C-alpha cells in the first residue's frame, strides 16, 4: 500500500461537512494545486431568513478555519461519475482490486476528472438534477467524505468496492 497525498494534485472532496472540511485543510497543507469541495446542499444564507425567526435555531453560513486556508466550495452540485483522459469506458484499480465498468479512466487507470451536475430541491425526492448543467472538473485525487445525509448509492458508490452499513452509510 502507498501513501495518499494531495501534493501537486487537483483535489475534489465530495461532501462539505466536518470530514470534508478536514480533508480540505489537509489537502491545502499538503500542497495541492487546487481543492474543490462539492456540497450537494445549497449554501446557507448569511443572515437569518424570515422563516427562521428568533428564538428558532437559524441555519446560517459559517466559514470554517479550513475554508479560510483556501479552496473552493461548490454548492447544490452532485457527482455523476469519474472520467479519464481517453473518455472511453475503462476499469479503475483501487488498491489492487478492480471496480465496475462505470468508471472512465486514462490508460493507467487513473481518474483525471469528475463529472458533476447542478441539483435543486426535488418534488419527489431530496434533489433533482438540472438538465444542461453537467460539466467535468479536473481531478487527480477524489476524496469521498459523505455520510451524514447518507450517500446516494446509485451513482459513484455503486462503482466502488464499498460496503454500506444498515443505515446506508459507508461501513467502517
Residue ranges and their predicted role:
Residues 20:
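N-terminal Rossmann-fold NAD(P) dinucleotide-binding loop
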Residues 80-89, 163, 169-172:
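Short, intrinsically disordered, charge-balanced linker/junction segments flanking boundaries
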Amino acid at each position: 500500500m502507498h501513501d495518499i497525498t494531495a501534493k501537486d494534485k487537483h483535489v475534489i472532496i465530495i461532501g462539505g461537512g466536518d470530514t470534508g472540511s478536514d480533508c480540505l485543510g489537509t489537502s491545502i497543507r499538503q500542497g495541492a494545486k487546487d481543492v474543490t469541495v462539492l456540497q450537494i446542499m445549497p449554501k446557507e444564507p448569511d443572515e437569518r431568513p424570515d422563516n427562521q425567526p428568533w428564538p428558532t435555531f437559524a441555519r446560517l453560513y459559517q466559514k470554517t478555519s479550513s475554508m479560510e486556508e483556501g479552496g473552493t466550495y461548490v454548492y447544490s452540485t452532485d457527482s455523476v461519475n469519474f472520467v479519464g483522459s481517453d473518455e472511453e469506458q475503462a476499469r479503475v484499480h483501487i488498491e489492487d482490486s478492480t471496480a465496475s465498468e462505470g468508471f472512465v479512466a486514462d490508460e493507467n487507470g487513473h481518474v483525471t476528472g469528475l463529472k458533476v451536475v447542478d441539483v435543486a430541491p426535488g418534488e419527489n425526492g431530496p434533489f433533482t438534477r438540472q438538465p444542461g448543467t453537467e460539466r467535468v472538473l479536473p481531478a487527480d485525487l477524489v476524496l469521498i467524505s459523505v455520510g451524514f445525509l447518507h450517500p446516494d448509492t446509485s451513482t459513484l458508490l455503486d462503482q466502488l468496492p464499498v460496503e454500506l452499513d444498515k443505515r446506508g452509510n459507508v461501513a467502517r
